[in-house]
Amino acid sequence: MEVILLERIGRLGQMGDTVKVKDGYARNFLLPQGKALRANEANKKKFEGQRAQLEAQNLERKNEAQAVADKLNGESFIVVRSAGETGQLYGSVSTRDIAEIITANGFTLHRNQVELNHPIKTIGLHEVSVLLHPEVQVKVMVNIARSTEEAERQAKGEDLTSIEAIYGIEEQPLSEEVFDDEDEAEDQA
């Protein structure tokens, strides 16, 4: 089905473009959400008549998103999850979890605005993209740790998945003298 886009949609096109999409995508998403019109002569004339108004609305939404982006850019959010000794999470942190954390900190965000290729399954600092508007994207830091104390240590740059962090720095390897004594005892026997 051919549709006329009423706003910029990633991987499809800009406002005003006539693009061919699958029927289900048009019927179930683009048309009900008001993001597109069916491409016919009547709708093309209707779109051209409303083009200036649509561009003004788009610019207003973009300016609002840019204001939020200025506040959100570079922010760091802490997610506390249980994990094993090696830093592997029991479960994962998904787009929904990240959206809930950001929303709890006073920003309005939906999970489909968080761009994550795959769920996060390890502790550490992870950079996540947030798409506030089709033309406004911002990066935030998600600090995943077992506790808030660990999150503070990670924020300072400490690697909590290293051997020293797991077993402690005081752990010393056995000295060679212990092995030498055993060898002498075996020789005497």
From Swiss-Prot:
Gene coding for it = rplI
Q: Which UniProt keywords apply?
A: Ribonucleoprotein, Ribosomal protein, RNA-binding, rRNA-binding
Give the signal sequence positions: none
Task: Tell me which family the UniProt entry assigns to this protein.
Answer: Belongs to the bacterial ribosomal protein bL9 family.
Q: Choose any GO biological process term that the UniProt entry carries and state it.
A: translation
Q: Which InterPro entries match?
A: Ribosomal_bL9, Ribosomal_bL9/RNase_H1_N, Ribosomal_bL9_bac/chp, Ribosomal_bL9_C, Ribosomal_bL9_C_sf, Ribosomal_bL9_N, Ribosomal_bL9_N_sf
- Which HAMAP family does the entry link to? Ribosomal_bL9
Which species?
Answer: Brucella ovis (strain ATCC 25840 / 63/290 / NCTC 10512)
Q: Which GO terms describe its cellular component?
A: ribonucleoprotein complex; ribosome
Q: What does this protein do?
A: Binds to the 23S rRNA.
What name has this protein been given in UniProt? Large ribosomal subunit protein bL9
GO molecular function per UniProt: rRNA binding; structural constituent of ribosome
Q: Which Pfam families match?
A: Ribosomal_L9_C (PF03948), Ribosomal_L9_N (PF01281)
Check the record and name the SUPFAM superfamilies matching this protein. L9 N-domain-like, Ribosomal protein L9 C-domain
